[in-house]
Swiss-Prot record:
GO terms for molecular function: ribonuclease P activity. The lineage of its organism: Archaea, Methanobacteriati, Methanobacteriota, Stenosarchaea group, Halobacteria. Belongs to the eukaryotic/archaeal RNase P protein component 3 family. Its main location: cytoplasm. Part of ribonuclease P, a protein complex that generates mature tRNA molecules by cleaving their 5'-ends. Keywords: Cytoplasm, Endonuclease, Hydrolase, Nuclease, tRNA processing. This is Ribonuclease P protein component 3. Consists of a catalytic RNA component and at least 4-5 protein subunits. Its EC number is 3.1.26.5. The gene is rnp3. One of its GO terms (cellular component) is ribonuclease P complex. InterPro entries: Pol/histidinol_Pase-like, RNase_P_comp-3_arc, RNase_P_p30.
Length: 240
């Protein structure tokens, strides 16, 4: 299972601190949402070497990602175009109906994060996300860090989102959205907290595993061996 983290300068902990803590908690990998924290894996650089070193040192996968937080769909589209070829995982922050719609209708987007952040998510968006292979994030951070009315509202949003996503079989990811290594929770804690408020345990595990599945798929697509889904270049195949 994987967790998707915010690292310095966007978060309060370095990638190394996140990796060390996540490994200790039993994660197989982390997805680093913060673009500035790691250079793209496609480029040979000090940061790329650091990611490899972290994998070697902690035995945990470190995935370069970007979380695009744009003011509108036009700006988000430009950012997706800029980062898709460089980043292993591309996320778009929701926040209004226009951004949510853009994200689920754009196959180059891997994950729509925080879809209830200021807009709404309905059956039309759920079907579009399913058809375009865009995962919808369930941010469980409020289960651990919010209190009072804010926590109640977040839970209501999560339950509404779950009903729509499960009904239309929309792909999903799950995260506690940690901004510090102190915010990280072991997979079993995330599952237990979600189960306590009515979520199916295996469904939550699927959402934690999905981050790694997205990374694996995208790495394969970027490799020279990839031709199309289900077909790889063999030793006797050449470009036409």
């Amino acid at each position: 299972m994987y967790e998707a983290v915010h690292a310095h300068p966007d978060g309060d902990a370095t990638v190394a601190r996140h990796a060390a803590t996540a490994e200790r908690y039993g994660y197989e990998g982390i997805v680093v949402r913060t673009r500035e924290a790691l250079d793209p894996a496609s480029k040979s650089s000090e940061h790329a070497d650091e990611a490899t070193a972290l994998r070697d040192e902690y035995g945990i996968d470190v995935v370069d990602a970007v979380e695009i937080d744009a003011d509108n769909a036009t700006s988000a589209s430009g950012a997706v175009g800029n980062y898709r070829s460089d980043r292993t995982v591309v996320c778009v922050v929701g926040g209004d109906d226009g951004l949510n719609r853009f994200a689920v209708e754009e196959p180059r987007v891997d994950v729509l994060v925080r879809p209830m952040g200021g807009g709404d998510f309905n059956h039309v968006l759920a079907k579009a996300a399913r058809d375009n292979g865009v995962h919808v994030e369930f941010d469980l951070g409020p289960l651990f860090r919010a209190t009072g009315g804010k926590r109640v509202r977040a839970l209501a949003d999560l339950r509404k989102l779950r009903e729509i996503v499960t009904y239309y079989d929309t792909p999903h990811v799950v995260s506690a959205n940690p901004r510090s290594h102190l915010d990280l929770r072991a997979p079993r804690e995330v599952v237990a907290a979600a189960e306590a408020v009515g979520f199916d345990a295996e469904w939550v595990r699927e959402g934690l595993r999905a981050w790694g599945e997205i990374a694996t798929r995208n790495r394969e697509r970027r490799s020279e061996a990839f031709i199309e889904p289900g077909v790889r270049r063999g030793r006797y195949e050449e470009d036409g």
